[in-house]
A protein has these predicted regions:
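Extreme N-terminal starter segment of soluble prokaryotic enzymes
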Residues: 1-6
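Substrate/cofactor-recognition hotspot
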Residues: 19
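PLP-dependent aminotransferase-class I/II
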Residues: 22
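Short polar catalytic/cofactor-binding loops
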Residues: 9-14
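Cys-nucleophile CN-hydrolase/nitrilase-fold catalytic domain and related Cys-dependent amidase chemistry
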Residues: 16, 25-104, 108-112
Length: 112
């Protein structure tokens, strides 16, 4: 039995929508080529100026991780959402958070 994993490398910038479109396209390509595990890089959804980071941060229920869970479920893959800047509700602190999704789209683990 073989198991194919894919590590996606991409250059992200300050345009979150463009970054998410690129990530989705590459995830779909990896899955179409047989990958059952796909890993995205650190800060794949946004990379910009430090002063703009608070506005780019998301909660675990935000746009980026909702999309990643949906893709994992749709493509029936394990998906490691490299990391995003997480803004924990009720806290001023931000975290560099990675989330692993299972083939059912549910979060299996998170590292903050």
């Amino acid at each position: 039995m073989t198991y194919l994993a894919a590590a996606i490398q991409m250059s992200s910038g300050p345009d979150k929508a463009a970054n998410l479109e690129k990530a989705e396209r590459l995830i779909r390509l990896a899955a179409a080529r047989g990958a059952r595990m796909v890993a995205l890089p650190e800060v794949f959804n946004w990379r910009g100026k430090r002063a703009e980071e608070p506005a780019a941060a998301e909660s675990l229920e935000g746009e980026t991780l909702t999309l990643m869970g949906r893709l994992a479920r749709e493509l029936e893959i394990n998906l490691l959402a490299g990391s995003i800047t997480e803004h924990a509700p009720g806290q001023a602190k931000r975290y560099n958070t990675s989330v692993l999704f299972g083939p059912d789209g549910r979060s299996l683990a998170a590292y903050h």
